[in-house]
């Protein structure tokens, strides 16, 4: 439809033409680079993630709630096995419509992030917490853009009982990332690696996350962030858009990393994609709600440059990936 036809249609019937949400962001140029003094979470760092409880993550968020009460809010969604599942919302300042009779209001660009649904993947929670810390303390133009224009809704530790015991499953022995519909897999072997529980949504953690998703059906993206035991970072992909996003992000970051770290091999992408099967996972549930979901996996220890699980060089690289992925999403959906 041409612009003239759109205008004619609007004036003939002003309620008939619907134009999709538009977002006007001023985007910086280049690639975001994490600070060189990013703190690691290895056994040799001040914070050893595999020996910590979920509180080490919550402390970072709680500090932000105290420092920025007009922007950061906290909600205790529930308590499981004596441990809280917290939710934090990072809001920007919305423009006010001074006309009381108007129904035109600002629509936020919202991104949801869920981390550590597998308890022994503490690095995802740590990296995401550092992102939000830098989001409010950095004058980097990319951070300023995200801070001003994006609303983030976050569950930092989706499996606190597994986190504090450095194990994959929760205290019921259930893999929370296999406890969803659709495509739930029934199993009579509770000791199996990916045992998803006796039935879909049998676990309170799952029920709370489902409620979280239901309350965020206006989100532009749900990021399901995990850690893998080895290899370069990867995205599990569900469609062509995911592949194109991964190509763009890894192409830019590979150049950056290869320049900064001569240990990396040259002339190749330092990341890859994998197609995801349907296994009753969180991503399956989110996609069933018509939302765009990305599953991102970053390594416990970055090949070539990492020496210990969750050490500083690893965390710096995966923070690069997290932030530049969010930037790419905003840039291509605005």
Predicted features and spans:
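Active-site/substrate-binding loop(s) of hydrolase catalytic cores
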Residues: 107-110, 122-255, 259, 263, ...
């Amino acid at each position: 439809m041409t612009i003239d036809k759109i205008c004619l249609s609007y004036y003939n019937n002003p309620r008939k033409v619907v134009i999709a949400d538009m977002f006007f962001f001023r985007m910086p140029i280049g690639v975001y680079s994490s600070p060189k003094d990013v703190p690691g979470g290895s056994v040799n760092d001040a914070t050893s993630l595999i020996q910590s409880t979920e509180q080490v993550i919550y402390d970072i968020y709680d500090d932000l709630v105290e420092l920025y009460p007009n922007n950061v809010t906290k909600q205790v969604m529930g308590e499981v096995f004596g441990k809280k599942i917290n939710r934090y919302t990072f809001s920007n300042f919305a423009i006010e419509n001074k006309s009381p009779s108007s129904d035109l209001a600002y629509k936020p660009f919202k991104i949801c992030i869920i981390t550590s649904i597998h308890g022994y993947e503490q690095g995802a929670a740590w990296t995401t917490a550092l992102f939000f810390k830098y989001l409010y303390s950095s004058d980097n133009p990319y951070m300023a853009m995200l801070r001003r224009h994006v609303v983030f809704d976050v569950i930092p530790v989706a499996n606190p009982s597994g986190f504090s015991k450095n194990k994959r499953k929760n205290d019921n022995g259930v893999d929370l990332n296999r406890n969803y519909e659709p495509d739930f897999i029934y199993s009579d072997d509770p000791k199996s690696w990916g045992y998803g529980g006796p039935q879909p949504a049998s676990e309170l953690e799952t029920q709370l996350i489902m409620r979280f998703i239901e309350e965020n059906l206006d989100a532009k993206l749900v990021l399901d962030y995990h850690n893998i035991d080895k290899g370069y970072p990867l995205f599990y992909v569900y469609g062509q858009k995911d592949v194109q996003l991964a190509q763009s992000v890894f192409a830019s970051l590979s150049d950056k990393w290869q320049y900064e770290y001569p240990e990396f091999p040259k002339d190749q992408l330092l990341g890859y994609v994998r197609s995801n099967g349907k296994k009753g996972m969180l991503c399956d549930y989110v996609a069933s709600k018509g939302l765009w979901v990305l599953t991102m996996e970053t390594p416990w220890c970055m090949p070539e440059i990492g020496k210990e699980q969750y050490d500083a060089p690893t965390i710096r690289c995966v923070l690069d990936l997290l932030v530049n992925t969010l930037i790419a999403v905003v840039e291509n959906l605005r």
